[in-house]
Each structure stands twice: as structure tokens, then as C-alpha cells.
Amino acid sequence: MKTIKDRIAKWSAIGLLSAVAATAFYAPSASAHGEKSQAAFMRMRTIHWYDLSWSKEKVKINETVEIKGKFHVFEGWPETVDEPDVAFLNVGMPGPVFIRKESYIGGQLVPRSVRLEIGKTYDFRVVLKARRPGDWHVHTMMNVQGGGPIIGPGKWITVEGSMSEFRNPVTTLTGQTVDLENYNEGNTYFWHAFWFAIGVAWIGYWSRRPIFIPRLLMVDAGRADELVSATDRKVAMGFLAATILIVVMAMSSANSKYPITIPLQAGTMRGMKPLELPAPTVSVKVEDATYRVPGRAMRMKLTITNHGNSPIRLGEFYTASVRFLDSDVYKDTTGYPEDLLAEDGLSVSDNSPLAPGETRTVDVTASDAAWEVYRLSDIIYDPDSRFAGLLFFFDATGNRQVVQIDAPLIPSFM
């Protein structure tokens, strides 16, 4: 019996080791949507991205892609997130698969951080250049000091070609044209290898003798002063002197070779020009709002008043990059990411045209699997369970008005 048990244990161990070893031969590509891990309230109550467009879905190495649209800095900015006094327009992607050539807010070039005003809407444009082949999920993103990255909608872009074809030429202020992709690459490799060798030599010197147990015994015996000999001190001083000398000489050589240098530019750009949007002629009051967990749907009771001159209908509800549409009123033609677009996800109890001067209370339901897929339903577990978003109203000629809403959200488990 013991022999059988030993054989079972032996073959079980061999099988386990074989299975673990086999995993080394299978390494699938990682694919993830990082925005799902960001708190729902962050995506709902900070930056609202809309009217987005990606100029291309397939490019070759060295070709450019332009992302443009608008973003609204939500008036009900959460207290737990620092206000966007220092913000940076960024792009979320898996590493340097593209390089950013240009970034604009309000038509102004923004190579560094900017100050944004709460309650304002800005247009933006980012130009990217394809660097690495593959299928990449490219997001809009706003980095806020003290608030972290606020992720926006993302779209898959296919890059074709070979990375060896990539070029990133720039002309310096002295008139020299260089390729930043491989500029002074040999010099970079040399200094990395050089200081690595210095580090290995330093570690090698101190580890040439027994390291742990004998030295521990000497410390316990009260002979710690004997661990470092006079020769050790001389060698250490030699390493220190050589390091200082090399740094000084290398710096002097670099200053001589490149006499004209400009430091990296920092500081916060102010005076970003928001869009001058006309005040909406529609007012909306949220009477109550509930999220029905089993149905993956949010229901809102809205009181809508039309102060304008033409009848209007509700065509879209936007929150946290997810768009819920009433296809009878509005259809998307921008190529918005399909996983973030619920083309028939918006239903209104009475969505007949709301006449000028008329007030109507309606039940609005936004339903789609995106509530769970993108973890927006997690908002009901927050200590400040509030939702926020944008409502888009349209008249018969297609003119649009945007109204933001913000209200407590009550969960329903029935």
C-alpha cells in the first residue's frame, strides 16, 4: 500500500511540474479595458467626453490618427477628487505604441499641464503617430493632479507594418535634424553598460568573501568593527573618487559638445478658452432615480420644461462614456465604439415632441448590459451614491441642446 501511495505522489508531482512547465510555451496576448477598474463616480462626475471621432481605424507605421471632440468639466465635481487646477490632456494606450505629435485645447497648443474651469466645455484635438504594429485600444484621458487619470472612451486601432520602419525626425533650434527614435542610441547603450559594470564590480568586491553567516557570527561576538578592513576603506574611497571624476569629466564633455541646451518646460498653462455655448432653453428636474439591479436598467422621473421656440424630443443620455440612444430620435453616425453604444437603450414614457412653453413629467429608462460590463452599477455601493450625465435634446431640424443632470441614485433589488 505504501508503494502505491508513493507512486501516486510521485506521478502527481511529475504531472503538476509538467503542467506548470507547459505554461511557458503558451503566452497569449493580454487584452484589458482599464476603465472598468476606475470607480464609477469618477467616470460619471468628473469629465464628460462627447462628440468624439477617431479619424482612422487602420493605419500603417508612421501614419497619423487624429482624435478630436469635446469634454465638459462637470459642475458637481466630487469633493473626494482634487479640482482640475493642474490637468494634462493625455491618451490612454498600452505603452508607446503611438507617439503624440500635437495636443490642443480650445485651439491652443498644450504640450504641458493646463488649468480647467469647472462647469465649462472645451474642444480638443490630439494627433498621434503610429509606432508599433498591432491592435491597440486607444482612449482619451485627462490626468488631474491629486485625482489621477480620468479615462474616457476607447476605440481599437490597427497598426500595420514593421516597427523598424518607424521614424521620428525633428529639427533642433540649431538647424540639425535628428531621429529621436534612435538618436545617440549607441551612447545610451554605452553608459548603461558602463555603470552596470561599475555596479557589478562594487557588489563583486563585497561579496567575494563569505557574506551572511560568518559576518553574523562576528557581529554577535562583538567584532563588527573588524568586518571592514583598511583595504576595504581604500577600495571604497577609490570607487567614490572614480565615480565623481567620471561624472565631472562626462558632464564637461557633454557641455562642450552641446553648448546650447534648453531645460524641459514645466509650469501650468492658464487661460484655456472654453466653448461659448448658448444657454439651453430646456430645463430638467430629476424627481427621483433608481437603478434596478436584476434588470440592469436605470429609471429616472424627469420634469422637463421647454422654454424655446420649437418642439423638442429627448434623444440621448450619456454617462461615463456610455451612450443610451432613442433610435427614433437620433442615430449615431460617428463610428462610436460599439461596446459603449446602446443604440436602443433609451426609452421614454412619452417622447412625443414637447411644445414650446410645455412642461411634462416622464419616466426615462436607460438599460443595457454596459451597466454591469463597465461596472457602472457599482455606484449604488458608494457612500455618496449619486449619478451624473448629459441629456441631449433635438428639434425637428436636428438642432441639439445639452443639459447636465446630477441626482441621488437609489438601488432596487426587485
Swiss-Prot record:
Keywords: Copper, Membrane, Metal-binding, Monooxygenase, NAD, Oxidoreductase, Signal, Transmembrane, Transmembrane helix. Cu cation 3 binds at H137, H139. Residues 1-32 form the signal peptide. It holds the Pfam family Monooxygenase_B. It is found in: Membrane. It is an enzyme of class 1 (oxidoreductase). Its main location: membrane. GO terms for cellular component: membrane. Its EC number is 1.14.18.3. InterPro entries: NH3_CH4_mOase_B, NH3_CH4_mOase_suB_C, NH3_CH4_mOase_suB_hlx_hairpin, NH3_CH4_mOase_suB_N. It catalyses: methane + a quinol + O2 = methanol + a quinone + H2O. Cu cation 1 binds at H33, H139. The keyword Lipid metabolism does not apply. The chain crosses the membrane at residues 186-206, 235-255. Changing H139A: Abolishes activity of soluble pmoB construct. Cu cation 2 binds at H48, H72. Its cofactor is Cu(2+). It comes from the Bacteria. It is a multi-pass membrane protein. Methane monooxygenase is responsible for the initial oxygenation of methane to methanol in methanotrophs. At least in vitro, specific quinols can replace NADH as reductants. NCBIfam families: AmoB_BACT, CH4_NH3mon_ox_B. This is Particulate methane monooxygenase alpha subunit. It comes from Methylococcus capsulatus (strain ATCC 33009 / NCIMB 11132 / Bath).
